[in-house]
Amino acid sequence: MKQRLGLAIVLFCLMPALFAQQKAKQNAREDNASFMFTESQLNEDDDAAQSTSALVTSNNDVYLSNVGYLFSPMRFRVRGYDSQYSDMYINGVQFNDAETGRFSYGLIGGLNDATRNKEGIGPFEINNFTFGAIGGASNINLRASQYAAGSKLTLSGSNRNYILRGMYTYSTGLMNNGWAFTGSLGYRWGNEGNIEGIKYNSFSYFLGAEKVFNDRHSLSLATWGTPTERWQQMAATEEAYYLANSHYYNPNWGYQNGEKRNARIVRQFEPSANASWNFTIDDNK
């Protein structure tokens, strides 16, 4: 009798702990369920040019900066997420496309020096420009006062989409009168790189101005654009590569009246502008 009574007392004392553990497991299952994705959400993006996450170009993460493009022959997705789950901000304003949810890197193509000042974060990391995204987020700082004073000239050669690239960037830095100006010009040209029937012609520009009134207030204006025309390549079957005796075969091009023509020519120009008022809050006042 005493043994049964003692066992009943022990069970009665352990019931709250067992109930709490069961409730914790249930909450854990509910939390995990909120992070489940359907197959359609994780499908591959048909547009290969947009498969790179905004985080790939992050220069403050050793791993991400080494698995990005960097003239590499392959692409990378952070944790396998589609690029629509990564957010790109410019001066604190989100620039993901409203229809596709993805950021078009053609919007800032050829402006490598002007867009070099950026901050990248992982999924839901603490930051000062967004609530976060499951694929991470990046913010490009185009404020003219944040560029170092001076000029830079860049000349590059390649045998891929374009053959030659030239960029020139000049910045006054923050002057004594509180003004700062930055400008950048770029041009990329290619007349058939390593793939036949591919041409590339792109001009890019950036102009930024900022007026710093005091330590707490400043007004910034930035405008940029990249008018581009590019001939595209289309995927082909292994049989087509075998018959052409080349893995660089492009079915999009051919001759018409003795001149080369391409069936898919993309002409893109999305001029953009951003105006921002920067207010540094003083917690002591």
Q: Where does each model-flagged region fall?
A:
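Transmembrane beta-strand segments of Gram-negative outer membrane beta-barrel proteins
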Residues: T115-G120, G135-A137, L142-G157, F181-L185
